[in-house]
C-alpha cells in the first residue's frame, strides 16, 4: 500500500514542453453598403472597425511575435488595409520619432491615433483607419459602378495567399530572446574587422542557440450581408484550401439571417460561427468567443452553432437549392433542367427519356373526399394527377 501511495503522489512531468507559438490573425471585413444600411440602428461600420482594432491590439499584446492582417471586401474588389505593400512602416515610424516636436499642427491633426499609443498598435490602427476612409470615399463616389455580387471569396483568397506566404517564408520565427541574441551577435561581428574568425564562430553559436517556433494562423470574417449573392464554388474552394492548410475560419455574422455557405466554411475548418443578434457588445464577443488560439481549440468546447445548413448552390442559376438534380458524372447540382440537355460543367449528354420523365413531373396519388350516392353510401375515387 505504501508503494502504491508513493506512486500516486509522485509528480510526473509532462512530456510536452510548454510552447508559446506566434500566431497570425487575419480579419476580413465585408463593407457592402446595402447590408450595413439595414442594421444602421443597431451598430455602424465605424463602431465595428473600432472593435476590430481593439481585438487586433489584444492579439498583438499576447506575443511580441504575433502578426495581424486586415482585408476589406468592397463592391469594387478586395483590398489589403494592413499590411500595405506600398508603404514601409519602419520608415514612417522612424520619421515620426525623428521629427518629434517639430511636427506642425497640420500633421498632428491629420493623425488618426494618439501619439502616446504603443508603436505597433499605432502603426496598425493608423493604417487600417486611413485605408478605410479611402474606401468609404471611393464607394460614395462610385455607387453606380459597384458590383452587385459579393467579393468575399476574393478576400478569402487574399487571406489564404498571405497566410501561405507567412507560413512558408517565415515558417520558423525567432522569439524575442532569440532575436536579441542574433542582434547582439551581428553587432559584435560588425564592431571590428580583425576578429573575423571569432565573430563568425559567435554568429554560428548564436544561430544554434536560438529557439525557433512555428507560426499558427486563423481567419476572422465579419459580415452583415443577408443576401444570397455569395458564390458557392469559390467559397468552397477557399474552404477546402483552408482545411488543407489547417487554418480555422471564424465567422461573426451580423444582420437578420444566417449564411449557410459561411456556416459550412466555419464547420469544415473547425472554426467558430456565431450569429450576433445584438451587436452592441461586439467587443465582448470578439474578446471571448473569437479569442481562442488554434493551438488550444482541441481542448476547448467551441462556442459555435452545431446546426449547420448544408445547402448547395445551383450551377446554373447560382441560387441555393433545397431539392434539385445531380449529374451522375461530375456531381453537378442543378435546380432546373438545362435546355441543351447537357451538363453545364462536364458537358455530358443526358438521356432524352429520363429528361422527358423529369420534365413531366412527379406523379403522386391523391385521395379525394368521399362522396355520398343516392342510397347514402360513401364511395371514393382515386386519381393520379400530374404535378
From Swiss-Prot:
<comment type="similarity">
    <text>Belongs to the TFB4 family.</text>
</comment>
<feature type="zinc finger region" description="C4-type">
    <location>
        <begin position="327"/>
        <end position="346"/>
    </location>
</feature>
<keyword id="KW-0804">Transcription</keyword>
<dbReference type="GO" id="GO:0005675">
    <property type="term" value="C:transcription factor TFIIH holo complex"/>
</dbReference>
<keyword id="KW-0479">Metal-binding</keyword>
<keyword id="KW-0805">Transcription regulation</keyword>
<dbReference type="GO" id="GO:0000112">
    <property type="term" value="C:nucleotide-excision repair factor 3 complex"/>
</dbReference>
<dbReference type="GO" id="GO:0006367">
    <property type="term" value="P:transcription initiation at RNA polymerase II promoter"/>
</dbReference>
<feature type="compositionally biased region" description="Basic and acidic residues">
    <location>
        <begin position="89"/>
        <end position="98"/>
    </location>
</feature>
<dbReference type="GO" id="GO:0006289">
    <property type="term" value="P:nucleotide-excision repair"/>
</dbReference>
<dbReference type="InterPro" id="IPR004600">
    <property type="entry name" value="TFIIH_Tfb4/GTF2H3"/>
</dbReference>
<feature type="region of interest" description="Disordered">
    <location>
        <begin position="184"/>
        <end position="211"/>
    </location>
</feature>
<keyword id="KW-0539">Nucleus</keyword>
<keyword id="KW-0863">Zinc-finger</keyword>
<dbReference type="GO" id="GO:0008270">
    <property type="term" value="F:zinc ion binding"/>
</dbReference>
<keyword id="KW-0862">Zinc</keyword>
<dbReference type="Pfam" id="PF03850">
    <property type="entry name" value="Tfb4"/>
</dbReference>
<dbReference type="GO" id="GO:0006355">
    <property type="term" value="P:regulation of DNA-templated transcription"/>
</dbReference>
<comment type="subunit">
    <text>Component of the 7-subunit TFIIH core complex composed of XPB/SSL2, XPD/RAD3, SSL1, TFB1, TFB2, TFB4 and TFB5, which is active in NER. The core complex associates with the 3-subunit CTD-kinase module TFIIK composed of CCL1, KIN28 and TFB3 to form the 10-subunit holoenzyme (holo-TFIIH) active in transcription.</text>
</comment>
<protein>
    <recommendedName>
        <fullName>General transcription and DNA repair factor IIH subunit TFB4</fullName>
    </recommendedName>
</protein>
<feature type="compositionally biased region" description="Polar residues">
    <location>
        <begin position="99"/>
        <end position="109"/>
    </location>
</feature>
<dbReference type="GO" id="GO:0000439">
    <property type="term" value="C:transcription factor TFIIH core complex"/>
</dbReference>
<keyword id="KW-0227">DNA damage</keyword>
<feature type="region of interest" description="Disordered">
    <location>
        <begin position="89"/>
        <end position="109"/>
    </location>
</feature>
<comment type="function">
    <text>Component of the general transcription and DNA repair factor IIH (TFIIH) core complex, which is involved in general and transcription-coupled nucleotide excision repair (NER) of damaged DNA and, when complexed to TFIIK, in RNA transcription by RNA polymerase II. In NER, TFIIH acts by opening DNA around the lesion to allow the excision of the damaged oligonucleotide and its replacement by a new DNA fragment. In transcription, TFIIH has an essential role in transcription initiation.</text>
</comment>
<keyword id="KW-0234">DNA repair</keyword>
<dbReference type="InterPro" id="IPR036465">
    <property type="entry name" value="vWFA_dom_sf"/>
</dbReference>
